């Protein structure tokens, strides 16, 4: 128990006087730049330049000078910004955007200071997204069962605030956060509590992602601690974001034996060591153990969610499957462990017999139906895969259209380059060429066939995405190593933009 208490101990020196005064002070700029923050983080939100910190500060000053912000406890719409609804929504959204920018500052400073001192960053998981696939390729071959987990959204807004409350000890900033969240609910009274999280996700990406990441870290905290205890090589890449005030009080509701002997918990999960990986709201837990061990993990996670988040985890959100006959739908791939059998005839003296060898292979398949659905969602084709002219791009130059479609083809080809059956990705890349030809022919008022006959080699060269062209820049074609790489699968780990098949809706 003492080791667990040390594990969840946190340096609280920077938790006080957190951010609320900074919103109204000029020295926020000096505070940010003196600590080496990236300028782009502060000045603008990605993809939308109207939510700058300067605009938010001027807006707050203007609101207080003109007395726009009036709070009334007797008003039917409590804590609402008075005025026209459209203007209120704009004010609220801009302030929350500025709030989200400022609330990231201390955590960015923590990351930058850790990197500057060249220490292991314990409170940030810096693992590359695309390193997940080589990890699965190496580990799943030796495991038996897998537990598919869908991390639930918090059932109530207050849970989001409480998740942040045990990191931030500035009460005024937390009250301001509550004001923003309930302001959204009051101004949109027709939205049910179940729809509010989805509404926040679409309305204010930055603030929602910040709060949701804290929610996920809280969900993983005790789980990661138990995994570390069962490993001989302890992991230091995760930080423990445990609710430290009421945890021991809630622990007795899980299983009574937990409060009597904390070592019993560790014994349940000590061997064999489970492998855990997550992307966004979906995670998998794989183990070499038995089905009984996986059921223990399942009910442990259900109890933890009930007592720690007051959330009932529906059984349908946790699936236990055997890897030998189950495919994982993860990050846009259908992955499975395939058994390959080979029969060898052996003869000793006058006796001959057959020996059957069974080997495991990590198999990744490109799901063609979801891939077509993803292209249809982007208005490149219909649900049946028939090409549609991208009319909104017809105002662009031909070179810009070719560049955009070429980038789409390269992303699809590179993202699925590690697939063991890449025929579907090649077909999707070829279909993207037809989509491009349809768009260009519509722009020039000609047929697709005539357009292809006119361009021919230039058009195909723009979409040349064979991996041999990339490898030829790295290795000579006559080397034995390169010949092996040409025949094998290649994972491109430097892709920044992942298409929406990999994203959880």
Curated annotation (Swiss-Prot):
Listed name of the protein: Maturase K
GO MF entry, a single one: RNA binding
Keyword Plastid: yes
Keyword Nucleus: no
GO cellular component terms attached to this protein's record: chloroplast
Position of the signal peptide: none
Organism: Blitum bonus-henricus
Gene assigned in the entry: matK
PANTHER family to which the protein is assigned, alphabetical: MATURASE K
Family: Belongs to the intron maturase 2 family. MatK subfamily.
Keywords in alphabetical order: Chloroplast, mRNA processing, Plastid, RNA-binding, tRNA processing
UniProt subcellular location: Plastid, Chloroplast
Function: Usually encoded in the trnK tRNA gene intron. Probably assists in splicing its own and other chloroplast group II introns.
A Pfam short name: Intron_maturas2
UniProt GO BP: mRNA processing; RNA splicing; tRNA processing
Disulfide cysteine pairs (residue numbers): none
Domain of life assignment: Eukaryota
């Amino acid at each position: 128990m003492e080791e667990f208490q040390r594990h969840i101990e946190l340096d609280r020196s920077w938790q006080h006087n957190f951010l609320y005064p900074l919103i109204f002070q000029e020295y926020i700029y000096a505070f940010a730049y003196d600590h080496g923050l990236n300028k782009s983080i502060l000045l603008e939100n990605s993809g939308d330049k109207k939510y700058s910190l300067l605009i938010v500060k001027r807006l707050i000053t203007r609101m207080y000078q003109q007395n726009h912000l009036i709070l009334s406890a007797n008003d039917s719409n409590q804590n609402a910004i008075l005025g026209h609804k459209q203007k209120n929504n704009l004010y609220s959204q801009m302030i929350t955007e500025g709030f989200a920018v400022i609330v990231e500052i201390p955590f960015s400073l923590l990351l930058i200071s850790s990197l500057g001192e060249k220490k292991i960053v314990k409170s940030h998981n810096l693992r590359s997204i695309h390193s997940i696939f080589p990890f699965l390729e190496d580990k799943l071959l030796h495991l038996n069962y897998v537990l598919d987990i869908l991390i639930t959204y918090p059932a109530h807004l207050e849970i989001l605030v409480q998740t942040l409350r045990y990191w931030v000890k500035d009460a005024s900033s937390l009250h301001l956060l509550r004001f923003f969240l309930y302001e959204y609910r009051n101004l949109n009274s027709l939205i049910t509590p179940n729809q509010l999280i989805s509404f926040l996700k679409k309305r204010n990406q930055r603030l929602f992602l910040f709060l949701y990441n804290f929610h996920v870290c809280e969900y993983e905290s005790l789980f990661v601690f138990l995994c570390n205890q069962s490993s001989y090589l302890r992991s230091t890449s995760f930080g423990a974001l445990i609710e430290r005030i009421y945890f021991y009080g809630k622990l007795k509701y899980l299983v009574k034996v937990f409060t009597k002997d904390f070592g019993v918990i560790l014994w349940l999960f000590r061997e064999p060591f489970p492998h855990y990986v997550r992307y966004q709201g979906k995670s998998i837990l794989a183990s070499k153990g038995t089905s009984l061990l996986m059921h223990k993990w399942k009910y442990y996670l259900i109890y933890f969610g009930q007592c720690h988040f007051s959330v009932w985890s529906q059984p349908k959100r946790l699936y236990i499957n055997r890897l030998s006959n189950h495919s994982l739908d993860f990050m846009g791939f259908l992955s499975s462990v395939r058994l390959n059998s080979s029969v060898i005839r052996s003869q000793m003296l006058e006796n001959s017999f057959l020996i059957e060898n069974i080997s495991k292979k990590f198999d990744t398949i490109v799901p063609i139906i979801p891939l077509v659905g993803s292209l249809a969602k982007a208005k490149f084709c219909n649900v049946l895969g028939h090409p549609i002219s991208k009319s909104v791009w017809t105002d662009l130059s031909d070179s810009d259209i070719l560049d955009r479609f070429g980038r789409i083809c390269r992303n699809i080809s590179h993202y699925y380059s590690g697939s063991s059956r890449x025929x579907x990705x090649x077909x999707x890349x070829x279909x993207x060429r037809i989509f491009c030809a349809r768009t260009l022919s519509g722009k020039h008022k000609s047929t697709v066939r005539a357009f292809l006959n006119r361009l021919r080699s230039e058009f195909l060269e723009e979409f040349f995405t064979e991996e041999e062209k990339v490898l030829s820049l790295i290795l000579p074609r006559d080397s034995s190593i390169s010949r092996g790489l040409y025949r094998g699968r290649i994972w491109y780990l430097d892709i920044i933009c992942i298409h929406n098949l990999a994203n959880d809706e």
